Regions:
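Serine-dependent protease modules
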Residues: 20-253
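Bacterial N-terminal signal peptides that target proteins for export
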Residues: 1-8
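Short, linear, compositionally biased motifs with a strong N-terminal bias
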Residues: 11-14
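C-terminal motif of bacterial Sec signal peptides marking the signal peptidase cleavage site
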Residues: 16-18
Length: 253
């Protein structure tokens, strides 16, 4: 009787263990299927957004330029003229004729201006138009290359708060830097260098730092929607509040 009981108990233990193992496999399989089913949708969204950002930067960055404002100074004991950098900023190619748009405060007071393209070629530039009341300036580079790349124009009147934006520029002299964010607000007012009020300005949380001035603000289609021009920051560095002049205003100048 004892042997029979012992055999019966062993059989029951083995049977229950097998059942438990099967249930565990089924449960784990179900969880794995759930994770696998959920993962592609999330990863696909992230990948699409990243791919969009990467593609925009790849296409737009060749149109972004480095603008250097220089002063000329004659040496005390020689007739040689020295070039003293007074400041720098960003600009972008407006058309294939070599017109460059930037901020007025980037080029103000310059005795010589140079524009460096993405291929590192440096070109002298002349000022052909300014609108201090809008903090805008237009330059023309000498001997523009045939392969100058421009930016497609968007319509800033169609912007909505929350839309994705991208800023490309040269903050602190670090050329071709990309930052991203959203449209934080529309219709802001800021002061131009002429102390006149610029209305209808775009506010964004995309990082804009000294050196970004004059660079393009783009939408998720890679279209130009604004010119980065100012930040609100007690420290002078980005505090998540940047401003851009709408492209529709630029087109009117």
């Amino acid at each position: 009787v004892t042997r029979a009981l012992r055999a019966f108990l062993l059989f029951c233990t083995a049977f229950l263990g097998a059942c438990s193992s099967d249930d565990s496999v089924i449960a784990n399989s179900a969880l794995a299927d759930t994770r696998d089913a959920d993962a592609p949708e999330y990863l696909s969204f992230a990948t699409q957004d990243e791919a969009n950002t990467t593609e925009i930067f790849s296409k737009a960055s060749p149109a972004v330029v480095f603008v250097t404002n220089k002063a000329l100074r004659r040496g005390l004991f020689s007739l040689n003229v020295e070039e003293i950098p007074r400041g720098s900023g960003t600009g972008f190619v407006w058309n294939k004729a070599g017109l460059i748009v930037t901020n007025f405060h980037v080029i103000a007071g310059a005795q010589r201006l140079t524009v460096t393209l993405q291929d590192r070629s440096e070109h002298d530039a002349e000022v052909i138009g300014v609108a201090p009341e809008k903090d805008l300036a237009v330059l023309r580079i000498e001997n523009p290359p045939d392969d100058l790349q421009t930016l497609p124009l968007g319509d800033s009147s169609e912007l909505q708060v929350g839309r994705k934006v991208l800023a490309i520029g040269n903050p602190f002299g670090l050329d071709t830097t990309l930052t991203t964010g959203v449209v934080s607000a529309l219709g802001r007012e800021i002061k131009a260098p002429s102390n006149r009020t610029i209305r209808g300005v775009i506010q964004t949380d995309a990082a804009i730092n000294p050196g970004n001035s004059g660079g393009p603000l783009l939408n998720s289609l890679g279209q130009l929607i604004g010119v980065n021009t100012a930040i609100y920051s007690p420290s002078g560095a980005s505090a998540g509040i940047g401003f851009a002049i709408p492209v529709n205003t630029v087109a009117e100048v």
